[in-house]
Protein backbone atom coordinates (compact mmCIF):
# COMPACT_ATOMS: atom_id res chain seq x y z
CA UNK A 1 0.00 0.00 0.00
CA UNK A 2 1.34 3.41 -0.96
CA UNK A 3 2.35 5.65 1.89
CA UNK A 4 0.17 8.71 2.40
CA UNK A 5 2.08 11.88 1.68
CA UNK A 6 1.76 15.44 2.90
CA UNK A 7 1.11 18.03 0.21
CA UNK A 8 1.28 21.80 0.28
CA UNK A 9 -2.43 22.00 -0.58
CA UNK A 10 -3.43 20.47 2.77
CA UNK A 11 -4.45 22.30 5.90
CA UNK A 12 -2.09 22.06 8.86
CA UNK A 13 -4.45 19.60 10.58
CA UNK A 14 -4.67 17.40 7.49
CA UNK A 15 -0.87 17.22 7.35
CA UNK A 16 -0.69 16.19 11.01
CA UNK A 17 -3.27 13.46 10.41
CA UNK A 18 -1.00 11.95 7.73
CA UNK A 19 1.84 11.69 10.27
CA UNK A 20 1.19 12.93 13.83
CA UNK A 21 4.92 12.86 14.59
CA UNK A 22 5.47 16.01 12.51
CA UNK A 23 4.00 17.85 15.52
CA UNK A 24 7.51 18.14 16.94
CA UNK A 25 8.80 19.96 13.85
CA UNK A 26 5.76 22.23 13.70
CA UNK A 27 6.20 23.10 17.38
CA UNK A 28 9.90 23.83 16.87
CA UNK A 29 9.03 26.22 14.04
CA UNK A 30 6.21 27.73 16.14
CA UNK A 31 3.59 26.72 13.56
CA UNK A 32 0.19 26.45 15.22
CA UNK A 33 -1.34 23.04 14.55
CA UNK A 34 -3.97 23.14 17.31
CA UNK A 35 -6.20 26.21 17.04
CA UNK A 36 -4.59 27.03 13.69
CA UNK A 37 -5.07 23.54 12.28
CA UNK A 38 -7.72 24.72 9.84
CA UNK A 39 -5.32 27.10 8.12
CA UNK A 40 -3.61 26.14 4.84
CA UNK A 41 -0.21 24.54 5.42
CA UNK A 42 1.34 26.71 2.70
CA UNK A 43 0.11 29.88 4.40
CA UNK A 44 1.32 28.81 7.85
CA UNK A 45 4.76 27.76 6.61
CA UNK A 46 5.38 30.84 4.46
CA UNK A 47 4.30 33.09 7.35
CA UNK A 48 7.40 31.79 9.15
CA UNK A 49 9.61 32.67 6.18
CA UNK A 50 10.04 29.06 5.06
CA UNK A 51 9.93 27.68 1.52
CA UNK A 52 6.83 25.50 1.31
CA UNK A 53 8.25 22.93 -1.13
CA UNK A 54 11.39 22.19 0.88
CA UNK A 55 9.40 22.22 4.13
CA UNK A 56 6.88 19.68 2.81
CA UNK A 57 9.76 17.50 1.59
CA UNK A 58 11.23 17.61 5.11
CA UNK A 59 7.87 16.69 6.67
CA UNK A 60 7.51 13.71 4.37
CA UNK A 61 10.92 12.46 5.47
CA UNK A 62 9.80 12.21 9.11
CA UNK A 63 9.49 8.54 10.03
CA UNK A 64 6.57 7.70 12.33
CA UNK A 65 7.77 6.69 15.79
CA UNK A 66 6.81 3.05 16.33
CA UNK A 67 6.35 3.46 20.08
CA UNK A 68 4.32 6.65 19.65
CA UNK A 69 0.66 6.60 20.72
CA UNK A 70 -0.10 9.65 18.59
CA UNK A 71 -1.25 7.68 15.54
CA UNK A 72 -3.40 5.45 17.77
CA UNK A 73 -5.55 8.45 18.67
CA UNK A 74 -6.97 8.49 15.15
CA UNK A 75 -8.23 4.93 15.59
CA UNK A 76 -9.79 5.36 19.02
CA UNK A 77 -13.49 5.40 19.80
CA UNK A 78 -14.98 8.49 21.43
CA UNK A 79 -14.77 6.90 24.88
CA UNK A 80 -11.17 5.79 24.36
CA UNK A 81 -10.10 9.21 23.11
CA UNK A 82 -11.80 11.03 25.99
CA UNK A 83 -10.05 8.71 28.46
CA UNK A 84 -6.74 9.25 26.64
CA UNK A 85 -7.12 13.04 26.74
CA UNK A 86 -7.91 13.05 30.45
CA UNK A 87 -5.08 10.68 31.43
CA UNK A 88 -2.38 11.93 29.06
CA UNK A 89 -3.17 15.65 29.06
CA UNK A 90 -5.58 16.90 31.74
CA UNK A 91 -3.92 15.18 34.70
CA UNK A 92 -0.27 15.90 33.79
CA UNK A 93 -1.04 19.46 32.70
CA UNK A 94 -2.82 20.29 35.94
CA UNK A 95 0.30 19.12 37.78
CA UNK A 96 2.50 21.19 35.47
CA UNK A 97 0.37 24.28 36.06
CA UNK A 98 0.88 23.96 39.82
CA UNK A 99 4.58 23.23 39.42
CA UNK A 100 5.20 26.22 37.15
CA UNK A 101 3.20 28.55 39.40
CA UNK A 102 5.30 27.59 42.44
CA UNK A 103 8.51 27.87 40.43
CA UNK A 104 7.68 31.33 39.10
CA UNK A 105 6.77 32.50 42.62
CA UNK A 106 10.19 31.31 43.81
CA UNK A 107 11.93 33.07 40.91
CA UNK A 108 10.19 36.34 41.76
CA UNK A 109 11.88 36.29 45.16
CA UNK A 110 15.30 34.97 44.13
CA UNK A 111 15.70 37.18 41.04
CA UNK A 112 13.66 40.19 42.17
CA UNK A 113 16.58 42.63 42.08
CA UNK A 114 17.41 42.21 38.42
CA UNK A 115 14.42 40.59 36.73
CA UNK A 116 11.29 41.52 38.68
CA UNK A 117 9.70 43.48 35.81
CA UNK A 118 10.00 40.62 33.31
CA UNK A 119 9.00 38.01 35.89
CA UNK A 120 5.97 40.03 37.02
CA UNK A 121 4.80 40.01 33.41
CA UNK A 122 5.50 36.30 32.91
CA UNK A 123 3.81 35.39 36.20
CA UNK A 124 0.66 37.40 35.47
CA UNK A 125 0.38 36.02 31.94
CA UNK A 126 0.90 32.45 33.12
CA UNK A 127 -1.63 32.77 35.95
CA UNK A 128 -4.19 34.09 33.47
CA UNK A 129 -3.67 30.92 31.40
CA UNK A 130 -4.02 28.74 34.49
CA UNK A 131 -7.18 30.57 35.55
CA UNK A 132 -8.69 29.75 32.15
CA UNK A 133 -7.61 26.12 31.96
CA UNK A 134 -8.52 24.77 35.42
CA UNK A 135 -12.28 25.45 35.08
CA UNK A 136 -12.10 24.56 31.37
CA UNK A 137 -10.78 21.07 32.15
CA UNK A 138 -13.39 20.63 34.89
CA UNK A 139 -16.24 21.61 32.57
CA UNK A 140 -15.05 19.18 29.92
CA UNK A 141 -14.71 16.28 32.37
CA UNK A 142 -17.87 16.87 34.39
CA UNK A 143 -20.26 18.20 31.76
CA UNK A 144 -19.33 18.23 28.06
CA UNK A 145 -17.53 14.89 27.73
CA UNK A 146 -20.12 12.83 29.67
CA UNK A 147 -23.00 14.31 27.66
CA UNK A 148 -21.10 13.72 24.42
CA UNK A 149 -20.42 10.08 25.34
CA UNK A 150 -24.08 9.69 26.31
CA UNK A 151 -25.07 10.51 22.74
CA UNK A 152 -26.27 14.06 23.36
CA UNK A 153 -25.64 16.78 20.80
CA UNK A 154 -22.95 19.01 22.29
CA UNK A 155 -22.09 22.44 20.92
CA UNK A 156 -18.31 22.56 21.12
CA UNK A 157 -18.03 26.10 19.76
CA UNK A 158 -17.59 27.56 23.26
CA UNK A 159 -14.77 25.14 24.05
CA UNK A 160 -13.08 25.87 20.71
CA UNK A 161 -13.33 29.61 21.42
CA UNK A 162 -11.74 29.05 24.84
CA UNK A 163 -8.97 27.02 23.20
CA UNK A 164 -8.30 29.91 20.82
CA UNK A 165 -8.23 32.44 23.67
CA UNK A 166 -5.73 30.35 25.64
CA UNK A 167 -3.72 29.79 22.47
CA UNK A 168 -3.38 33.55 22.00
CA UNK A 169 -2.26 34.01 25.60
CA UNK A 170 0.25 31.19 25.23
CA UNK A 171 1.63 32.72 22.04
CA UNK A 172 2.07 36.05 23.86
CA UNK A 173 3.90 34.27 26.71
CA UNK A 174 6.10 32.55 24.15
CA UNK A 175 7.01 35.93 22.66
CA UNK A 176 7.66 37.87 25.89
CA UNK A 177 10.00 35.09 27.10
CA UNK A 178 11.71 34.96 23.68
CA UNK A 179 10.83 31.28 23.33
CA UNK A 180 11.48 30.66 27.05
CA UNK A 181 15.05 31.94 26.88
CA UNK A 182 16.71 32.20 30.28
CA UNK A 183 18.78 35.34 31.10
CA UNK A 184 22.55 34.89 31.40
CA UNK A 185 22.43 35.10 35.21
CA UNK A 186 19.49 32.71 35.53
CA UNK A 187 19.83 29.97 38.15
CA UNK A 188 19.04 26.26 37.75
CA UNK A 189 15.46 26.85 38.86
CA UNK A 190 15.10 29.54 36.19
CA UNK A 191 16.28 27.06 33.55
CA UNK A 192 14.03 24.30 34.85
CA UNK A 193 10.85 26.39 35.06
CA UNK A 194 11.31 27.94 31.63
CA UNK A 195 12.03 24.48 30.19
CA UNK A 196 8.85 23.24 31.86
CA UNK A 197 6.84 26.10 30.36
CA UNK A 198 8.11 25.19 26.91
CA UNK A 199 7.15 21.55 27.45
CA UNK A 200 3.74 22.62 28.74
CA UNK A 201 3.14 24.75 25.64
CA UNK A 202 3.98 21.88 23.29
CA UNK A 203 1.84 19.45 25.26
CA UNK A 204 -1.13 21.83 25.31
CA UNK A 205 -0.91 22.36 21.55
CA UNK A 206 -1.05 18.59 21.03
CA UNK A 207 -3.90 18.28 23.52
CA UNK A 208 -5.98 20.94 21.76
CA UNK A 209 -5.30 19.34 18.37
CA UNK A 210 -6.78 16.04 19.56
CA UNK A 211 -9.90 17.83 20.75
CA UNK A 212 -10.46 20.37 17.95
CA UNK A 213 -9.39 18.21 15.01
CA UNK A 214 -10.43 14.71 16.11
CA UNK A 215 -12.77 14.42 19.11
CA UNK A 216 -15.06 17.36 18.38
CA UNK A 217 -15.53 16.14 14.79
CA UNK A 218 -16.72 12.68 15.84
CA UNK A 219 -20.39 11.81 15.49
Where are these predicted regions, by residue range?
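Small-residue-biased structural context
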Residues: 1-219
Amino acid sequence: MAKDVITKDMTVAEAVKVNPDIMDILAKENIDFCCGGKHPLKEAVEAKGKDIDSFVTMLNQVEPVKESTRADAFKMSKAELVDYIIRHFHRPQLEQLDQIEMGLAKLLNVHYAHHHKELFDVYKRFMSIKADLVPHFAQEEQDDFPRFLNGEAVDFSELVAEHEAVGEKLEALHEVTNNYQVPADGCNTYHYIFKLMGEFERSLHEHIFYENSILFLMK
